[in-house]
A protein has these predicted regions:
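Active-site rim/loop-helix segments in enzyme catalytic domains that contact anionic ligands
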Residues: 28-154, 176, 183-187
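Intrinsically disordered, low-complexity Pro/Gly/Ser/Thr-rich segments with frequent PxxP/GP/PP motifs
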Residues: 403-440
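Short acidic, flexible loop segments centered on an aromatic residue
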Residues: 388-404, 408-411
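Bacterial N-terminal signal peptides
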Residues: 11-24
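Asparagine-centered strand-capping/turn motif at beta-strand->loop junctions
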Residues: 382-387
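Terminal connector regions
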Residues: 439-471
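Metal-dependent de-N-acetylase/amidase catalytic core
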Residues: 8, 28-47, 130-136, 140-361
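Short, solvent-exposed loop/turn segments enriched in Ser/Thr/Gly
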Residues: 373-380, 430-431, 443-449
Length: 472
């Protein structure tokens, strides 16, 4: 090579490469936009709180996957790090690892392999469940964004989640919170203004470090709830009912047996109980009909019809819920001059249900809780003053024989007597937490507690709570 001539030829190579790419592009025709990842497409998305909550509906999920060939994905909002361990010493972070493994094995046994675990904290058991505790400790908006993302990723026709209501049963507040968030996500996943970074196109999908996710908005068609209530009279005819005694055509055993087998993988939570039932042939606890509660359907169909009744194959348009409207709030007189109502989760649900078009839920059952014999527990109350003047409320508590009031239980008060005065400012409210002590019963039974109030001598209404006291 002659002296002084450069040996650097990279620019020419680049020019040739660019020209070659241009020729290839012309040969291939116009660029196309890739469709959503079909590997994630689901017919059903289940949103539950803890690894093992899915076992409540394992019989139906087996039916859907094994015999109806539906695609099911599952999201757990927690990893169950506050749960018990009936087979070992592992707890906290370690029990979460084990419970995740158990859930994957359990769901895998019925053909469900697409499972995600969020990292919301598993809320320890309180005296009385309050969904607001879970929503607060979870960082509500963060978990909501995650569930919206999974709806947009999986594009389900149907969302199945836990009942957002307070019922007698296990009724963990995390269970309720998963239902609240799944309901909100059902209503928001089709709205591009919510979590817009999820639906914005990436700057360069063929390169690294994109911050926008490139998802599509998605409107699910139907929303169903399941419950861990200990009494199921209130769910009859509120949704489809499936027999767990039916025989699976693919497995040649009952769905009850399949459900027991699925549950048996959750050894830390159930020890050997499902295995014992399977070995002894006593499947009675798994053979009860499984009844879902229809939250809402955007495609019609009857309340008790099959979960997929009315579902269409093509995407449906976004259907916003009505949102919060004070005139539609189930406030039991809050728009009156004075009122008294149950607070906490009960007050929240009175606004939540109508805001999300859950028009059947207020009629499910009257306010209730379950407590143990002799248990000391709190009940939240709220006094409302909707006038332009401060008023003094007088509160009265009516309890059956054997009940007692904790004399230091009223928040913002020195002592709570059967009758107590509370000054409530103009256009304000006064929250109370009253602790009651249940009697000791030999047999379980329902009891009724009634609170009534006067405001400057005028009736301000009353509110009632049904309490199921478990006998010794």
């Amino acid at each position: 090579m002659p002296p002084g001539r450069s040996t650097y030829r990279f620019p020419r190579f680049v020019c040739l490469s660019v020209a070659a790419c241009a020729n290839v592009a012309l040969a291939q025709g116009p660029a196309t936009s890739p469709p959503p990842d079909e590997r994630l497409k689901a017919d059903i998305l289940v949103v539950a709180a803890h690894p093992d909550d899915e076992s409540l509906i394992a019989g139906y999920l087996a039916r859907a996957v094994l015999d109806e060939h539906k695609r099911v994905c599952v999201v757990f909002t927690t990893r169950g790090d506050a749960g018990q361990n009936l087979v070992g010493y592992e707890q906290a972070r370690s029990i979460a690892e084990i419970r995740e493994m158990e859930a994957r094995q359990a769901l895998g046994s019925i053909g469900i392999t697409t499972v995600w675990f969020l990292r919301a904290p598993d809320t320890p058991y309180p005296d009385v469940p309050d969904v607001l505790r879970s929503l607060g400790s979870w960082n509500h908006g963060n978990v909501l964004g995650e569930v919206v993302r999974f709806i947009r990723l999986t594009r389900p026709d149907v969302v199945i989640t836990m009942l957002p209501d307070i019922v007698v049963g296990e009724n963990h507040e995390d269970h309720q919170a998963s239902g609240v968030i799944a309901t909100e996500a059902f209503d928001l996943a089709g709205d591009p203004t919510w979590f817009p970074e999820q639906v914005a196109p990436p700057e360069d999908r063929l390169w690294y470090s994109n911050l926008m996710e490139g998802l599509h908005t998605w409107q699910p068609e139907k929303l169903y709830y399941f419950t861990d209530a200990s009494h199921l009279d209130f769910v009859k005819d509120k949704g489809p009912e499936y027999s767990m005694k039916d025989i699976s055509p693919s497995r040649h055993v009952s769905y009850a047996r399949i459900a027991a087998q699925e549950t048996s993988f959750h050894k830390t939570q159930y020890d050997g109980e499902p295995a014992t039932s399977l070995a002894g042939g006593d499947l009675s606890s798994y053979e009860q009909n499984l009844i879902f509660i229809l939250g809402k359907s955007l495609v019609g169909g009857s309340t008790t019809g099959d979960i997929f009744q009315g579902v269409v194959s093509d995407p449906i348009p976004f259907r916003p819920s009505r949102g919060y409207q004070q005139s539609n709030t189930l406030n039991h007189g809050r728009n009156a001059e004075f009122s008294i109502e149950l607070g906490g989760g009960w007050a929240f649900y009175r606004s939540f249900w109508p805001s999300h078009n859950l028009d059947s839920l207020p009629r499910l059952l009257e306010p209730e809780i379950g407590v143990g014999s002799g248990q000391n527990f709190p009940v939240p109350l709220v006094l409302h003053n909707n006038t332009n003047n401060a008023v003094t409320f007088t509160l009265r508590t009516q309890v059956p024989p054997g009940w007692s009031l904790d004399s230091n239980s009223a928040q913002y008060a020195h002592h709570l007597l059967p009758e107590k005065a509370f000054l409530v400012a103009a256009n304000d409210y006064f929250p109370l937490r009253i602790r009651l002590v249940a009697p000791r019963f030999s047999k379980s039974q329902w009891q009724e507690i009634i609170w009534s109030a006067d405001a400057d001598g005028r009736p301000a209404g009353s509110t009632t709570l049904r309490v199921y006291v478990t006998g010794n």
